[in-house]
Amino acid sequence: MNNRVFDKTIKSLSAAMQMRQHRQNVISANVANAETPNYRAKKMDFEGALKRAIDLEDLGRMHVSHGDHFVMGQGAIGRVRPDIYDNPEINYTNDGNTVDLEKEMAALNENSIIYNAATKLINKKLAALKYVASNGGR
């Protein structure tokens, strides 16, 4: 995707879709462990990292707090890695588990909706490029 045809929008949408896949895995793990004693629900912060990567893409260099947060090289947008951590917003149950199944299912639904929206946007962008490529010389 280093070609100029694939602009910042496509790179950003692609990275957002990858983030949604990561988030799906995190939420699925939380749901799967809803009955596991002492399991701590995980949370993922990707939006902040994605925003920083998009902002820094044009600067040509990146400042990071930890070397593993970004992979340097062919552009920052598509190579951002999300931070996954124990969710501090959840209360413990009697067995020490912190999964709130209702919140996790709502997050799963929200994640699915946003993933589908990103998919539609990238498909429209690619359809426009296909149209221009096939009808540009007419």
Annotate each PLM feature.
Residues M1-R138:
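Amphipathic alpha-helical polymerization modules
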